[in-house]
Curated annotation (Swiss-Prot):
The 26S proteasome consists of a 20S proteasome core and two 19S regulatory subunits. The 20S proteasome core is composed of 28 subunits that are arranged in four stacked rings, resulting in a barrel-shaped structure. The two end rings are each formed by seven alpha subunits, and the two central rings are each formed by seven beta subunits. The catalytic chamber with the active sites is on the inside of the barrel. Pfam families: Proteasome, Proteasome_A_N. This is Probable proteasome subunit alpha type-4. Belongs to the peptidase T1A family. The gene is pre6. It is found in: Cytoplasm; Nucleus. NCBIfam families: PRK03996.1 (NF003075).
Length: 259
């Protein structure tokens, strides 16, 4: 088995490319990132690791601008993501220079996935240990678009999705609570609440970007995230109190009837 997991382009006897699977494992060990569509907005949220006190926080940004209308978030190896982001930015600029038109979200996703796929077949390299979430609005179109790419070079369109170590729990939460036609505030609220299911309840551990058609991307300040977190916690406490009073109500009713 050791020969197969060292060779990039050699299949194991059961049809697996083990180096690609190791890249997927690097993604599963990465911090969580989510992206979801609203009615006419996109919200991208990522879990941020605790940063040493003397380190510049800007070096740990997990949401990058590829073009004015395209954002990319990732889970996995930071250095690998940096290479993919740089390649995506160059491709977006080349497309604009050659065709005098901004790149479409699907085209850019297909390009990034193509780069990842090439690194599963080429000699002298290894697969990227990164999954990406590519989101934005095509110029002149108000349709929100969210795509996910994987180390194997696969890409898919999503209404809401999650990647990283807690992606399963976050995606299950999104599946239960996401619906068509969410307003901007509802989409932001759902993004934060889904991240709170898997990260520590502090604004410093959450990075949030909101995209609207034809507007600059808005990165929410920690104070705003704090306010949303408090609202969600208050709602949970109120819901727990309602459930508790609902359970105790039958007992009270029975006692009064006997009296």
């Amino acid at each position: 088995m050791s020969g197969y997991d060292r060779a990039l382009s050699v299949f194991s006897p059961d049809g697996r490319l083990l180096q690609v699977e190791y890249g997927q494992e690097a993604v599963r060990r990465g911090t969580t990132a989510i992206a979801l569509r609203g009615n006419e907005c996109i919200v991208i949220g990522v879990e941020r690791k605790n940063v040493p006190k003397l380190q510049n926080v800007s070096n740990f940004q997990k949401i990058a601008m590829v073009d004015n209308h395209v954002c990319l978030a990732f889970a996995g190896l930071n250095a690998d993501a940096r290479i993919l982001i740089d390649k995506a930015r160059v491709e977006a600029q080349n497309h604009k220079l050659n065709l005098a038109d901004p790149v479409s979200i699907e085209y850019l996703t297909r390009y990034v996935a193509g780069v990842q796929q090439k690194y599963t077949q080429s000699g002298g390299v290894r697969p990227f240990g990164v999954s990406t979430l590519i989101a934005g609005f095509d110029v002149g179109d108000n349709t929100p678009r969210v795509y996910q790419t994987e180390p194997a070079g696969i890409y898919n369109a999503w209404k809401a999705t999650a990647i990283g170590r807690a992606s399963k729990a976050a995606r299950e939460y999104l599946e239960k609570n996401w619906k068509e036609g969410l307003s901007r505030d509802e989409t932001i609220h759902l993004a934060v609440s889904s991240l709170l299911e898997v990260v520590q309840t502090a604004s410093g551990n959450i990075e949030l970007a909101i995209m609207d058609p034809g507007k600059d991307v808005e990165f929410l300040h920690s104070d705003k995230i704090d306010t949303i977190v408090k609202e969600i916690q208050d709602e949970k406490e109120a819901e727990a109190a309602r459930k508790k009073s609902g359970r105790s109500a039958p007992g009270v009713s029975t006692t009064s009837t006997i009296q």
